């Protein structure tokens, strides 16, 4: 059976490509983004009361991962990219309907002249232009489960790199983007299958290409170039 689902909004973020996007929402809370509604959904009444919630659920599409067919198993980056798990036991973008689910923090609601009412959020893990299908409020009494188990993610742990971002290069970024850039780099933006020591990688972020190398647990930024 096929169903039709409409795009209600798109995410405006600092990521022009999927490279380097945090693998989960809220890993880098300094990241800022804006939800811009499609013209037919720019009705302020549809957002009445939303300012009373601190967090929102975003249902969206992995638009860069759409492909024909699907695989019942995938390789989660958190397991090094070598171990296969069932697709429905992971948050992999390579799934039957390519749907993503993210919880973001609502920073504010703004009425604009050109784009109607927009939502400013933080902690989003979405590429610029990502299609959004629905928005729902996060309800603490129903959505929070302190005793929840995290499956294989409980044992994988959270590993952060030490980031050496020289002051002269960091100064090339807008002041409001610096903390977010360091946060993104600390989570090792490299794909799990492309981690060669000494190789120079480029992270497109906030209008710049941030080039870096990684040796063991240390990431060093070597160049910042405007895109």
Where are these regions (language model features)?
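Conserved positions in beta-strands of structured domains
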Residues: 12, 104-107
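Mixed-charge, low-complexity intrinsically disordered regions
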Residues: 1-99, 111-120, 124-227
